[in-house]
């Protein structure tokens, strides 16, 4: 039989690539993974199934229907439901060939998203017996994923007895078989379990299949009761990067059933156990390790390790990849871990099993102590592989080990971060977070390292007015950026990463904020104004508009720099207020001008002088409202009262007289602690009152002689 042609140039290129695995870890020429691929090709059930062609007239109709649903040009939901019923009626009996057609599969996916519960069951039944073939198809696999998410929501609805038949549906929606009444009452759980039984013999071949592996991942998430991720977000565990981009291009949006988890019936736990047993049976360590570094199969194994603890306390999949927690260093395991630490797919696998849970803490600690602890700094220099594992370990290991990693990295942080190559920016942010979580461990040294790297000529203890713009240039690379381009260039991903990194520095310590102000002053004013209108750099300007809290006290030198920085916005307030990016900056200026009433009044006067232009703009109206400009124009005294209230809030002063003006603003944690102490005191008082009442009743019983039935008994004699 003629072998099917391998699809795509990437597959051909991949077959010509030279194996780059370490010498210690080298699979045989004919690995079990390749044998498994041969089994897929030889399995008749997994061959491309032909369900028929859609003729040109049908394609035109369904394409028009898809466009109608896309624009959603319906007056109300009832009109849309009627349209969907008519399209489903036209598609009856053609569902299988529609989902395998490139154009019509988009229509079927939209129909699944908008279908009622009863229509959803009917579509599910039409796919029965063909789920395996549909999961292995390029187009129908996407429709099947959407159908499974909707099915999970319907299962939860049936569990809480909230499933109702829609009154507006007609009898033609159900099949014309004699037993249609029986089909209508079959639960979604029963249909889902039947589908799982259909998949069960083919699970091992689905693990590393280009399309069905995504379906398998979704099945694991559903039966484990985990959150079903969005299909369009960049960090989704469900779709590939290319698939998410394509989904955005065809404008298919998720409904409310995505980005949440669903309640599952008890039978799903048995199904999860059955699925894990099927995938883990007759598995050997060599084959599992090959799957762990396989681009397609690796995400499936990550999920299996994450959920296997629900049904398997022995953690079979973990021990099919790594040795037990009591084992010593093993040469083969060491070579495999080294490959994980140096390979892009392998490092993503190891990072995921560390970060997302599933693996026991003692398993992770063993790998860290045996194979990573003595070379933390070396791994941190692998900016595309090993550094991600170190970042994951920072938030998983015990405090002592985290401090050890910080001791290794902080002294060398300046040499690890490279803005030119966009290397280890995330490492810098995670080191800051780890230091904060450990009571600001080595904070001063960390700040000093960052200034040595990005502003070596700046003295943060004595900021001077003759500071250059080296800090902004070293962090943002303004020269050569899209700043000032007139071709409407989109900001690049590198610019976005650099901006987020600088914003993290300013959030970490106010000395970075002051340094940023001085760098803004060193720039040409036109260059600074361009930053205010830039899609990414405007966020840097916005986040630099922060004032030192009154509890810490703002030095006079910093106050002078703040005034000089505010002068840069003069005569540009109106244009900024009418811009989508600049309006956020003007909003921030309200709090940034605290204690500087002259500057606040000047900004208000600029807005009032061109009030007509500001009010005509959508963004300008929001700025006008946030600055309370109606009071500024009509009731200036009330506006100044708002300014006075802002100053009192800044100093933490109450509105009533006689309160100390130097009272420090209490932090939220302090207010929460005071509330807890009050509640504790009230509980103690209630307990004391209850105890006093109990003792009083006991004394009465002793005095009047209560019996076991709490009845008072008369006592005769003089001792009564």
Curated annotation (Swiss-Prot):
- Where does it reside? Nucleus, Nucleolus
- Compositional bias (Basic residues) at which positions? 1-13
**Superkingdom of origin:** Eukaryota
Known InterPro entries for this protein?
A: ARM-like, ARM-type_fold, NOP9, PUM-HD, Pumilio_RNA-bd_rpt
What Gene Ontology molecular function terms does this protein carry?
Answer: mRNA binding
Pfam families to which the protein is assigned, alphabetical:
PUF_NOP9
Keyword Lyase present in the record's keywords: the answer is no
Give the family this protein belongs to, as stated in its UniProt record.
Belongs to the NOP9 family.
**This chain belongs to which protein, by name?**
Nucleolar protein 9
Organism name: Debaryomyces hansenii (strain ATCC 36239 / CBS 767 / BCRC 21394 / JCM 1990 / NBRC 0083 / IGC 2968) (Yeast)
Q: What is the lineage of its organism?
A: Eukaryota, Fungi, Dikarya, Ascomycota, Saccharomycotina
